[in-house]
Amino acid sequence: MITRLSHLFLRTLRDDPSDAEVASHKLLVRAGYVRRIAPGVYSWLPLGLRVLREVERVVREEMNAIGGQEILLPALLPRDPYEASNRWTEYGPNLFRLKDRKGNDYMLGPTHEELFALTVKGEYNSYKDFPVTLYQVQTKYRDEERPRAGILRGREFLMKDSYSFDLSDEGLTESYQAHRGAYEKIFTRLGVKYVIVSATSGAMGGSASEEFLAESEIGEDTYVRCLESGYAANVEAVKTVVPDSIPFDGLPEAKVYDTANTPTIDTLVDWANGADLGRTITAADTLKNIMVKTRLPGGEWELLGIGIPGDREVDEKRLEASLEPAEFVMITETDFKNNPFLAKGYIGPKALQANGVRYLVDPRVVDGTSWITGADEDGKHVVGLVAGRDFTPDGTIEAAEVRDGDASPDGAGTLVSARGIEIGHVFQLGRKYTDVFTVDVLAENGKPVRPTMGSYGVGVSRLVAVIAEQHHDEKGLRWPAEVSPADVYLVIANKDETAREGAEGLAAQLDRAGLEVILDDRKASPGVKFKDSELIGVPLIVVVGRGWADGKVEIRDRFTGESREIDADSAIEAIISAVRG
């Protein structure tokens, strides 16, 4: 196919859009691939849609290769199935909710586990029908509080979601591994640099969970890896290495001190190092207690105390993952007034437990560890409060930040952090949703058996931005051949009619050879055409210019920047060879 730029619906821009922060957003808008309609909502223009469709093609090919069958469910979903699974509430403000004219509740679907489970229930009733994997490429909706980075984090996005149904846990493991392998092939074909990390399941539920993260400094996800072993995990999924407990024998008794004007860890450490405690005190010797309120879906707010070493900050993503499906908020001045046993800046574990407040601690707070912490009175701290002797937590919680140099959970070395963009996620859901909807089929022995599910997602539209983020330079985009909007970008850089006819002839021959050609036949200067060719990012640029009179054609490699002249008579063979390798 030949696409003539003189006819193509395309307007390139010389300046970056004012709201663009990352390279992919800037370049996709400047190159005329997408246009913003509203915060987090974008239109796909012809070239952008081509790239999007190429990504879809690769995803479909690999899904079909593992036996997936494509269906399409509605994006407008009734409330009842999601009420049954409790996710109507669990998703909170992230859902787009609406009512029809009769007052019935609907939502724009962020995910489809419930509908897939009900679909299988409605069609299959025998063990002979299983295993089965269904998938769709569907528009999803999420009411992001702060849409950013163009199509990387929008309110409307295209996603491939697939669901496996097996009659045994062994079958689920096979389906999970098949999807995992398919995802590796997808991202490799798309030219994406990625890492697979252990993850949490969140509102999806289930057990085993891994994320595919595209390596990127602008990524919103922080992950850690152990260079010695290859262990990698999203920070939400990292399990703290628990130290050995310490015998109580010989530990001094706890003592309360007057510590006026020390409501922060820094001021407390300054006081301690001037109080002649017999050793140098650091923030790691202190135990800070953070107060939040939590609420299970449909439940009431409850106070929760969280104790972590004073040299660590709370990582809200880790806290959120640890508390799910409950939501949390930090307590307010009103909460302090309503609970006078909370001494702001001087909270300790004893008053919390004496007043029935659940108290969870960092896994490092093991029996025998001694802490400087609040004494539950304004201007007072206790020194030498020993876990397991002077206070007994109700459990542990992964809420403290993970830092470079922390011990790897596999014991092989230390952790280093990096950032990435989530492009895929695989879950072993188990029977969470088949239990909700009583999806039972007859087993070979004539008794009912309940299928177990896997859920697998790929961010299709996000991948376009990820590829742009990883494959660009200061001049513009550089699409991998697998997803490029064309195979060849042919520039007519000479006003001579003979050169124009030669370019038209080249384009026609390339078309007959099965190549996709963008032909820049506009009445614009060569400089404008060259800039647009680099901005648009087709991997091979062919220039019919001054050399045409001497029987020469120029070939430019958009990735390497290399340029060479070839004989016009052998240009077709050379171009086809360059495209197809």
UniProtKB/Swiss-Prot annotation:
Q: What is its main location?
A: cytoplasm
Task: List where in the cell it is found.
Answer: Cytoplasm
> What residue ranges carry the coiled-coil annotation?
none
GO: which molecular function terms? aminoacyl-tRNA deacylase activity; ATP binding; proline-tRNA ligase activity
* Assigned keywords, A-Z: Aminoacyl-tRNA synthetase, ATP-binding, Cytoplasm, Ligase, Nucleotide-binding, Protein biosynthesis
Report the Pfam families cross-referenced here: HGTP_anticodon, tRNA-synt_2b, tRNA_edit
The Enzyme Commission number assigned here is 6.1.1.15
Q: Name one GO cellular component term.
A: cytosol
Which reaction does this chain catalyze?
tRNA(Pro) + L-proline + ATP = L-prolyl-tRNA(Pro) + AMP + diphosphate
GO BP terms, alphabetized:
prolyl-tRNA aminoacylation
Say what the protein does.
Catalyzes the attachment of proline to tRNA(Pro) in a two-step reaction: proline is first activated by ATP to form Pro-AMP and then transferred to the acceptor end of tRNA(Pro). As ProRS can inadvertently accommodate and process non-cognate amino acids such as alanine and cysteine, to avoid such errors it has two additional distinct editing activities against alanine. One activity is designated as 'pretransfer' editing and involves the tRNA(Pro)-independent hydrolysis of activated Ala-AMP.
The entry assigns this protein to a family as follows:
Belongs to the class-II aminoacyl-tRNA synthetase family. ProS type 1 subfamily.
Q: Domain note for this entry?
A: Consists of three domains: the N-terminal catalytic domain, the editing domain and the C-terminal anticodon-binding domain.
Q: What is this protein called?
A: Proline--tRNA ligase
Provenance organism: Rhodococcus erythropolis (strain PR4 / NBRC 100887)
Q: Provide the taxonomic classification.
A: Bacteria, Bacillati, Actinomycetota, Actinomycetes, Mycobacteriales
